[in-house]
């Protein structure tokens, strides 16, 4: 499963670890992804999304029905 938020589109970034001596070694910064089930009242079923914590805040703000409608509008299967 890819490490991409279904709501925000956040994906891993690349950067450097920096030691005390300022040596640089490559590393990945991973998004804080969570598998979360949401209840859709109008469909009477649960939907499981792999979303970042920022995506959870967006769902709290807009509502799950609006976010699911946006996902379906851009062609994502939910």
UniProtKB/Swiss-Prot annotation:
GO terms for biological process: translation. It comes from the Bacteria. It comes from Shewanella halifaxensis (strain HAW-EB4). This is Large ribosomal subunit protein bL28. It holds the Pfam family Ribosomal_L28. The keyword Ribosomal protein applies. Belongs to the bacterial ribosomal protein bL28 family. Keywords: Ribonucleoprotein, Ribosomal protein. One of its GO terms (molecular function) is structural constituent of ribosome. Residues 1-21 are annotated as: Disordered.
């Amino acid at each position: 499963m890819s490490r991409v938020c279904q709501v925000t589109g956040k994906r891993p970034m690349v950067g450097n670890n920096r030691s005390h001596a300022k040596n640089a070694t490559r590393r990945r910064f991973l998004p804080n992804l969570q598998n979360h089930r949401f209840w859709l009242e109008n469909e009477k079923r649960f939907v499981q999304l792999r979303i970042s914590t920022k995506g959870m805040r967006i769902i709290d703000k807009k509502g799950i029905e609006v976010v699911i409608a946006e996902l379906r509008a851009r062609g994502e299967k939910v």
